[in-house]
Amino acid sequence: MGGQKTHFGFSTVNEDEKAGKVAEVFHSVAKNYDIMNDVMSAGLHRVWKHFTINTAHLKKGDKVLDIAGGTGDLSRGWAKRVGKEGEVWLTDINSSMLTVGRDCLLNEGMILPVSLADAEKLPFPDNYFNLVSVAFGLRNMTHKDTALKEMCRVLKPGGTLLVLEFSKIYKPLEGAYDFYSFKLLPVMGKLIAKDAESYQYLAESIRMHPDQETLKQMMLDAGFDSVDYHNMSAGIVALHKGVKF
């Protein structure tokens, strides 16, 4: 088969195949997503997201776009910050994840606009949002550079992008982290979610994602300024921040 190639975990696939394969993974894990996140990270994902929410300097009435918002953890936090005067969009490219996220928010009495949206072709006008966030979603995108440019496009001048993503762990911990990721994680996926393969992909996709400095440069290339990052949990995850001027 012809066409441009890209990675799907450690495998090489045609670019036009990756989105479908990623979709299969998240259709499979959607119902158990929050449970698995708690188990896999020993609850740390909630700490990472809480830090991300506290990093944003939002005010009442601000507009926020949550990309790859999944089960709505960040959207929930953003909505509390911007109040009823504000606007928070929960978006995801995966219908199963979006349905779970919408239902979770509804169960808490939160009615937010939701959109089935591809981050590489965002259905929003230029210069609209004060904040764009993407948590644990960028690594699954086929054309990360295109997605980052789209995020920049929809931000108002002075607006902020926050990217929370798995990253490059400190070198002395690599051996233990690899054992956990490739030996234990798929077993947990099989026992809890009845799906070892999706969690094997998760481990592989983390290793293929750009490291902290590479992602920083990608954000600069996409049009962001004042780009910096903060490592958490020894570099297991990093929060990148960029501003559109």
Swiss-Prot record:
This enzyme's EC code(s): 2.1.1.163, 2.1.1.201
Q: What GO molecular function annotation could you give as one example from this UniProt entry?
A: demethylmenaquinone methyltransferase activity
Q: What is the reaction catalyzed?
A: a 2-demethylmenaquinol + S-adenosyl-L-methionine = a menaquinol + S-adenosyl-L-homocysteine + H(+); a 2-methoxy-6-(all-trans-polyprenyl)benzene-1,4-diol + S-adenosyl-L-methionine = a 5-methoxy-2-methyl-3-(all-trans-polyprenyl)benzene-1,4-diol + S-adenosyl-L-homocysteine + H(+)
User: What keywords would UniProt list here?
Assistant: Menaquinone biosynthesis, Methyltransferase, S-adenosyl-L-methionine, Transferase, Ubiquinone biosynthesis
Known pathway: Quinol/quinone metabolism; menaquinone biosynthesis; menaquinol from 1,4-dihydroxy-2-naphthoate: step 2/2; Cofactor biosynthesis; ubiquinone biosynthesis
Tell whether rRNA processing is among the UniProt keywords.
no
Taken from the UniProt record, the cysteine pairs bridged by disulfide bonds within this chain are none
- Which top class of enzyme applies to this chain? transferase
Under the heading InterPro entries, the entry gives: SAM-dependent_MTases_sf (IPR029063), UbiE/COQ5_MeTrFase (IPR004033), UbiE/COQ5_MeTrFase_CS (IPR023576)
Pfam families according to UniProt: Ubie_methyltran (PF01209)
Presence of keyword Mitochondrion: no
Which residues does S-adenosyl-L-methionine bind? 71, 92, 118-119
Query: Main role?
Result: Methyltransferase required for the conversion of demethylmenaquinol (DMKH2) to menaquinol (MKH2) and the conversion of 2-polyprenyl-6-methoxy-1,4-benzoquinol (DDMQH2) to 2-polyprenyl-3-methyl-6-methoxy-1,4-benzoquinol (DMQH2).
Q: Tell me which HAMAP family the record gives.
A: MenG_UbiE_methyltr
Protein name stated in the entry: Ubiquinone/menaquinone biosynthesis C-methyltransferase UbiE
